[in-house]
Amino acid sequence: MSTTALVEGKIVQCIGAVIDVEFPRDHMPKIYDALILEGSELTLEVQQQLGDGVVRTICLGASDGLRRGTTVKNTGKPISVPVGKPTLGRIMDVLGRPIDEAGPINSDVVRGIHQKAPAFDELSPSTELLETGIKVIDLICPFAKGGKVGLFGGAGVGKTVNMMELINNIAKEHGGYSVFAGVGERTREGNDFYHEMKDSNVLDKVALVYGQMNEPPGNRLRVALTGLTMAEHFRDEGLDVLFFVDNIYRFTLAGTEVSALLGRMPSAVGYQPTLAEEMGKLQERITSTKTGSITSVQAVYVPADDLTDPSPATTFGHLDATVVLSRDIASLGIYPAVDPLDSTSRQIDPNVIGEEHYSITRGVQQTLQRYKELRDIIAILGMDELAPEDKLAVARARKIQRFLSQPFHVAEVFTGSPGKYVPLKETIRGFKMIVEGECDHLPEQAFYMVGTIDEAFEKAKKIQ
């Protein structure tokens, strides 16, 4: 459609990020149509049709200085963003415009951010495991290639650091393309991530889309869809793509803000009434088809450490693996602070991961569960009152707990110890030795912040 043929309307009301625009009655824009402001780069997205030619839109950008009577043009199509190889190595905003000052993105292909999820008969479930090199994840909640993973945790327990380490280990080993969507997170983290990718020479395989904390709610709500659209394009070209989202909770929160601005009645805890539908629309599109796969890792902030909050609770149902980060474990100084009793994966099945891996995982969890049950008795009566087999279980559990810690590559600057990548075979061998009692003679400090079990033996020699 040429610019001359665009239907014009006028702004009739501005309330924060919500703008009402009046069009001729017979040329009323459709829901999700993108409207552009004359003489400015501001884009509005139609959310509601109020009747009499008036539509209610959400502003994708700062609405400062807007006034009634300003001319608005209807593009006649939804927001479209550039996709494909020209987006790699670039930082873009919600509209796919470059924000890295490295010139325009010369992509011939653009794609609307609102797409239908693949049909059921196109889906392709996978049982192939994706090795992360992080012991606790590979053992307790292994990831499936083409699966969906959630990193759940409250404020400051290490979601972003865990995600950075996963990107570091998977994106570098994986060799394929990755898309990172920064949804409502800190600008500093986005900057750190960009330089991390640049320094490790994988920037040319990553497309970065940011709608950070300082952006209006419209941007934060749509930026996840922008990133997903880019990932879908690579998948539909037959590639295996990694899709990272930090943070899904901010997507929900932006939806809450927009919903309130649009005048919808809030539901439980003040969330939007359409929470499940909005989450479903996003999550159903993050999926693997017979053409290609999307493996997604999503950080999910847990408000007030309450996993029953509607936002994280709605996300749980869509995931194949959940990695739950615990404040109690973080307070012990054990990082990554993954809770081995709360975290789970659909891949924990002897037919998928093999009998040995399955039995070791369950053995580790049983030992830790026994320790958890005995902690109250120990706190009141002390270790001496325990039966000999319980003392042994506690000693092994404390070694397992420490062996689940691991130095990260991305945290080297803070910890001073070099990061470790532990292959799955080594992880299983190490935990098997602890569970079967082959390490009972070693002190528990030897297991803290090491990679393989051999390093624990070396450390024990130094301690003794």
Swiss-Prot record:
Positions annotated to bind ATP = 153-160
Q: What is its main location?
A: membrane
Chain ranges passing through the membrane: none
Membrane topology listed for this record: Peripheral membrane protein
Q: Where in the cell is it found?
A: Cell inner membrane
Alphabetical list of NCBIfam families matching this protein:
atpD
Name the protein family.
Belongs to the ATPase alpha/beta chains family.
Task: Summarize the subunit comment.
Answer: F-type ATPases have 2 components, CF(1) - the catalytic core - and CF(0) - the membrane proton channel. CF(1) has five subunits: alpha(3), beta(3), gamma(1), delta(1), epsilon(1). CF(0) has three main subunits: a(1), b(2) and c(9-12). The alpha and beta chains form an alternating ring which encloses part of the gamma chain. CF(1) is attached to CF(0) by a central stalk formed by the gamma and epsilon chains, while a peripheral stalk is formed by the delta and b chains.
What is this protein for, i.e. what is its function? Produces ATP from ADP in the presence of a proton gradient across the membrane. The catalytic sites are hosted primarily by the beta subunits.
Recorded protein name is ATP synthase subunit beta 2
